[in-house]
Amino acid sequence: MIQAGLRIDVDTFRGTRDGVPRLLELLDEAGLKATFFFSVGPDNMGRHLWRLARPAFFWKMLRSRAASLYGWDILLAGTAWPGKPIGRELGPLMRRTQAAGHEVGLHAWDHHAWQTHAGVWSVQQLGEQIRRGSDCLADILGQPVRCSAAAGWRADGRVVEAKQPFGFRYNSDCRGRGAFRPRLADGSPGIPQVPVNLPTFDEVVGPGLPREAYNDFILERFAAGRDNVYTIHAEVEGLLLAPAFRELLRRAERRGIRFRPLGELLPDDPRSLPLAELVRGRLAGREGWLGVRQP
């Protein structure tokens, strides 16, 4: 049996409203549980269109055929009109996810703002964004938030420090191999991190890998004897690619891949996890910097 953590990022209003119910159906059909990370504040994701001036982002959007993949309502959200408040309007879907037995955590208050400004915000500004998102999601769920995942994996040592006061059991803020405890500025271990170590659809699909070949590509990258942490997006696998994701789940089962929530990948005693640094790095297929485990 190959154990794998399944992380579902929910970035937008439409992804929550339309993608989450579809994913809940598919996971129930497969008898699986996963971790959903919700964005709960305003949906301003359309403001990323201004990044088209950057060649790397323009190429990524062109390579993944973003307009057909996401839809124009997602690509324009929060541009010509105020972003819709996701948590306030769609909180019942987050409670439904929790009631179905899935792990629920915080992705962001404002996904666009975090992805755009996390690199320059102070620790205090980062903490305020985390507080707003955590308080909102806790009110929706009726219980404290126990895990989080930085939007766009935009995390570094400052983000690690900013999350310390919130009492999360773990965070999934970076890319890299194996769960670890990030080293804080004073040298002490921080809240455990569960990194993602498998590529996402939008990072690899393009002229060299057509959509139809993606399932073959990704399934070959799961391996026994290590942590396998895979991320999908409600806006992608919960909408246009839902049929392909259903087929992926069926094929994964036949290969002995068993998906579970990320929290179940942690040892009973987190003190057994190795210490490592969480630093800024680069990853093929993604525009800009992101958090990576080192070493």
From Swiss-Prot:
Residue span(s) of domain NodB homology: 2-260
Q: Give the GO terms filed under biological process for this record.
A: 4-amino-4-deoxy-alpha-L-arabinopyranosyl undecaprenyl phosphate biosynthetic process; lipid A biosynthetic process; lipopolysaccharide biosynthetic process; response to antibiotic
EC number from the UniProt entry: 3.5.1.n3
> Could you tell me the keywords of this UniProt record?
Antibiotic resistance, Hydrolase, Lipid A biosynthesis, Lipid biosynthesis, Lipid metabolism, Lipopolysaccharide biosynthesis
Reactions this protein catalyses: 4-deoxy-4-formamido-alpha-L-arabinopyranosyl di-trans,octa-cis-undecaprenyl phosphate + H2O = 4-amino-4-deoxy-alpha-L-arabinopyranosyl di-trans,octa-cis-undecaprenyl phosphate + formate
The Swiss-Prot or TrEMBL record annotates one GO molecular function as: hydrolase activity, acting on carbon-nitrogen (but not peptide) bonds, in linear amides
Sorted alphabetically, the Gene Ontology cellular component annotations on this record are: membrane
Pathway, according to UniProt?
Glycolipid biosynthesis; 4-amino-4-deoxy-alpha-L-arabinose undecaprenyl phosphate biosynthesis; 4-amino-4-deoxy-alpha-L-arabinose undecaprenyl phosphate from UDP-4-deoxy-4-formamido-beta-L-arabinose and undecaprenyl phosphate: step 2/2; Bacterial outer membrane biogenesis; lipopolysaccharide biosynthesis
Q: Which Pfam families match?
A: Polysacc_deac_1
- Which residues lie in coiled coils? none
Per the similarity annotation, which family is this? Belongs to the polysaccharide deacetylase family. ArnD deformylase subfamily.
Q: What does the record give as the function of this protein?
A: Catalyzes the deformylation of 4-deoxy-4-formamido-L-arabinose-phosphoundecaprenol to 4-amino-4-deoxy-L-arabinose-phosphoundecaprenol. The modified arabinose is attached to lipid A and is required for resistance to polymyxin and cationic antimicrobial peptides.
What this protein is called in its record is: Probable 4-deoxy-4-formamido-L-arabinose-phosphoundecaprenol deformylase ArnD
Q: Which organism is it from?
A: Pseudomonas aeruginosa (strain ATCC 15692 / DSM 22644 / CIP 104116 / JCM 14847 / LMG 12228 / 1C / PRS 101 / PAO1)
